[in-house]
């Protein structure tokens, strides 16, 4: 497959996108009585309302031509086939094999690895490690953000084990867990693709020392390795039955579907984890089969590119009106910004348009009393998303959940409609875009579909920008410099400011 297939056609399509007429959201609703049905997509137990975005038939036609110019169908097919679309690292991209999509051999391998994970979970449940109440999961980046999201969202009330996820190398993070967990009833899962990640290995060593200090006879025998480098885990003395591999071709930010999801599978039970996978697979089918104008990830990417490239928006906000999804914005920060925060295209040339949004967000209704002032009356355009479950899971007075939902819907309406006032300080300009994503209830299948939606949206944005969404070279330089400072703090090659900081704190 060519890297940038037809630059002239892509440039022409972008010009057509930029030339589309500008209308307010109110005008778009007034001119099209079918707008709501045209821009609402229901799939995989989720309801996406894109009608409060400035998309219309003219823009959709232009963006579909851009898809064609970018050879989108072929690139999507290559993604689903697990081909080597990570061209800068010459790697296949195979996280979707965990959900049953890809080369038959890769799907079979994923099933084998899932079976190993299930066997270990059943052994833990059966008492193979004695009485187990706690799991300490140690990882960083994608090895921690995904499991942490799943556990916080799905196991607050029904978790079978008490799971803590530690990613920060700051010792206070581990100490907080040590205060709460009984070391004799704790297992430790160490998640690292290479099984050499410096922060993760340091935290794992400290966890082993904690167990030894409290008289655990065989701390190593209570360690579980989640890795794409099982040989390295074996070298450290971890028995094969406690090594849960995943494929080298699975990137960290796409890895929660693999053995990296072990802590969530342990806490949820295997059936719950399987439902998560099935939800992701349902969104896969939708993304592959639905026409662009009724395809949720594609429509979301169209809106992203319109607001970024045409309207100059630099950020987008994710606001979950569900306390259990408070970690979703942090998870999406890595997914979107590490994937598409690039400056060169597939041919190594500087890209012509802004790359990924800065992703941020919060939880409603808290965020309304913190950041919505800027969203309603500030000078920056910030497309936002509201995410909510129709049914409550708490046992309190139903007025709690009703108030939560009414606030979410009211914010979207207010952002769109605005309100005039003789006093400029009390005037709301309106015409500010939002997308609302609803689910009947927050369950593993719905969360799996939601995460897969964001994955496919991120991929589509990458194709439209002509970039590789699956490498992350931008994280390397800082790590290299950290090693250099640790090994040679006296090094005179650093800038004057950094040398002064080293002198003040590290000598």
Swiss-Prot record:
Question: Where is it chiefly localized?
Answer: cytoplasm
Gene that encodes the chain: pgi
Q: Which residues form the active site?
A: 338 (proton donor), 369, 479
Recorded hits in CDD domains, A to Z, give: SIS_PGI_1 (cd05015), SIS_PGI_2 (cd05016)
Molecular-function GO term, any one: carbohydrate derivative binding
One annotated Gene Ontology cellular component of this protein: cytosol
Similarity comment: family membership: Belongs to the GPI family.
Localization per record: Cytoplasm
Gene3D superfamilies, per database record = 1.10.1390.10, Glucose-6-phosphate isomerase like protein, domain 1
Q: In which pathway does it act?
A: Carbohydrate biosynthesis; gluconeogenesis; Carbohydrate degradation; glycolysis; D-glyceraldehyde 3-phosphate and glycerone phosphate from D-glucose: step 2/4
Write down the Pfam families for this protein, in alphabetical order: PGI
Which InterPro entries does the annotation name? G6P_Isomerase, G6P_Isomerase_C, Phosphoglucose_isomerase_CS, SIS_dom_sf, SIS_PGI_1, SIS_PGI_2
The record describes the protein's role as:
Provides a gateway for fructose into the Entner-Doudouroff pathway.
EC number(s) per UniProt? Answer: 5.3.1.9
Name of this protein: Glucose-6-phosphate isomerase
Q: Which reaction does it catalyse?
A: alpha-D-glucose 6-phosphate = beta-D-fructose 6-phosphate
The record's keywords, sorted A to Z, are: Cytoplasm, Gluconeogenesis, Glycolysis, Isomerase
Q: Does the keyword Transcription apply?
A: no
Enzyme class label = isomerase
User: GO terms for biological process?
Assistant: gluconeogenesis; glucose 6-phosphate metabolic process; glycolytic process
């Amino acid at each position: 497959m060519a890297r940038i297939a037809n630059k002239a056609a892509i440039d022409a399509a972008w010009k057509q996108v930029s030339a589309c007429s500008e209308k307010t959201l109110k005008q778009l609703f007034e001119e099209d009585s079918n707008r709501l049905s045209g821009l609402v997509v229901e799939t995989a137990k989720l309801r996406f309302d894109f009608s409060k975005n400035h998309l219309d038939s003219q823009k959709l036609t232009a963006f579909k031509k851009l898809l064609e110019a970018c050879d989108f169908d072929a690139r999507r097919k290559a993604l689903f086939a697990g081909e080597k679309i990570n061209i800068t690292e010459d790697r296949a991209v195979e996280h979707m094999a965990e959900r049953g999509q890809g080369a038959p051999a890769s799907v079979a391998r994923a099933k084998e690895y899932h079976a190993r994970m299930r066997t270990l979970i059943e052994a833990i449940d059966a008492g193979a490690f004695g009485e187990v109440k706690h799991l300490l999961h140690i990882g960083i980046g994608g090895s921690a953000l995904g499991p942490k999201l799943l556990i916080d969202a799905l196991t607050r009330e029904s978790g079978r084990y008490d799971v803590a996820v530690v990613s920060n190398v700051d010792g206070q993070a581990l100490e907080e867990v040590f205060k709460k967990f009984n070391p004799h009833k704790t297992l430790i899962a160490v998640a690292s693709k290479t099984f050499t990640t410096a922060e993760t290995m340091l935290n794992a060593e400290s966890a082993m020392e904690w167990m030894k200090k409290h008289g655990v006879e065989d701390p190593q025998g209570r360690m579980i390795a989640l890795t794409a480098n099982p040989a390295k885990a074996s070298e450290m003395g971890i028995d094969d039955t406690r090594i849960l591999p995943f494929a080298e071709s699975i990137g960290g930010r796409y890895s929660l579907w693999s053995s990296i999801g072990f802590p969530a599978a342990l806490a949820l039970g295997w059936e719950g984890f399987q439902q998560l996978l099935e939800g992701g697979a349902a969104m896969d089918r939708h993304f592959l089969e639905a026409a662009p104008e009724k395809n949720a990830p594609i429509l979301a990417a169209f809106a992203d590119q319109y607001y970024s490239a045409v309207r100059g928006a630099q950020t987008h906000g994710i606001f979950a009106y569900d306390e259990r999804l408070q970690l979703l914005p942090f998870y999406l920060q890595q997914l979107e910004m590490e994937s598409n925060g690039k400056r060169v295209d597939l041919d190594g040339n500087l890209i012509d348009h802004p790359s990924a949004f800065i992703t941020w967000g919060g939880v409603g209704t808290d965020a309304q009393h913190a950041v919505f002032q800027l969203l309603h009356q500030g000078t920056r355009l910030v497309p936002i998303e509201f995410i909510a479950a129709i049914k409550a899971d708490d046992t309190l007075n139903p007025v709690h959940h009703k108030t939560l939902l009414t606030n979410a819907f009211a914010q979207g309406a207010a952002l769109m409609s605005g309100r005039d006032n003789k006093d400029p300080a009390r005037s709301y300009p309106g015409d500010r875009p939002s997308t609302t994503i609803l689910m009947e209830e927050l369950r593993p299948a719905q969360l799996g579909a939601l995460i897969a939606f964001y994955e496919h949206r991120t991929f589509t944005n990458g194709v439209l920008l002509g970039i590789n969404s699956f490498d992350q070279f931008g994280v390397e330089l800082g790590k290299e410099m950290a090693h250099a400072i640790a090994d040679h703090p006296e090094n005179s090659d650093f800038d004057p400011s950094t040398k002064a900081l080293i002198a003040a704190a590290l000598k």
